[in-house]
């Protein structure tokens, strides 16, 4: 894919949140509305270095709120057996399809990724099966807000219900916390402990942090 074609696709699919290098062309730059130097490749490098084995061979990954799909693609490139990416936003969903197509052409290999354009709260988890890792990067605090409004009583209940249902389908979660009342490290610690998970590793990132939770069993 030529650089001019990449630039054209990036513009057509804007606005972007995940910052991804596409053969020297960045999906988002410092003058763009959602620019965050840590979104995308920077965050993936932390996940890969701090939480994951060198290979994801024979593992299944669930990437919730996958956005443009960079963590899904990167997991597949680490030899994951299968990756399921879930994204509610229609434009981000289209970005994910484009990013997958780009990296398949760039790496010259088929990536076993399935994207689902849906609300996380509506997923048929029993049908999706079990996963070795569930990524919930910067998404838990968004669950329920499209139905009930952000941080309403109903939205917070749905977040807890979703985590409870997910806990039956994995032994490892990787999430991001912030420093608000309903998205802090302590808040999520209590939420996950109620479902049999303990904080295994915490990586501070200023006002945010990355956490690995592992099942007690």
For each of these PLM feature ranges, what is it?
Residues 170-178:
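Conserved beta-strand signature within the Rossmann-like core of class I S-adenosyl-L-methionine
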Residues 100-126:
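S-adenosyl-L-methionine
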Residues 38-56:
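Conserved alpha-helix/loop element of class I SAM-dependent methyltransferases that forms part
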Residues 96-97:
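Conserved SAM-binding loop
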Residues 82-87:
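Conserved SAM-binding motif I beta-strand of class I
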């Amino acid at each position: 894919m030529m650089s001019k074609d990449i630039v054209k696709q990036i513009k057509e699919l804007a606005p972007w949140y995940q910052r991804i290098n596409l053969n020297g062309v960045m999906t988002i730059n410092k003058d763009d509305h959602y620019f965050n130097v840590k979104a995308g490749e920077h965050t993936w490098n932390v996940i890969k270095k701090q939480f994951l084995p060198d290979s994801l061979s024979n593992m299944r990954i669930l990437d919730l709120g996958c956005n443009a799909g960079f963590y899904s693609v990167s997991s597949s490139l680490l030899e994951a057996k299968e990756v399921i990416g879930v994204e509610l936003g229609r434009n981000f969903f289209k970005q994910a399809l484009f990013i997958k197509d780009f990296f398949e052409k760039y790496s010259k290999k088929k990536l076993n990724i399935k994207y689902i354009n849906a609300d996380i709260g509506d997923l048929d988890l029993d049908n999706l099966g079990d996963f070795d890792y569930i990524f919930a990067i910067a998404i838990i605090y968004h669950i329920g807000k499209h139905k009930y409004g952000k941080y309403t009583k109903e939205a917070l209940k749905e977040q807890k219900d979703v985590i409870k249902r997910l806990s039956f389908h994995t032994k490892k979660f990787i999430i991001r916390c912030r420093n608000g009342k309903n998205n802090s490290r302590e808040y999520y610690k209590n939420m996950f402990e109620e479902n049999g998970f303990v904080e295994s590793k915490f990586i501070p990132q200023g006002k945010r942090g990355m956490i690995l939770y592992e099942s007690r069993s």
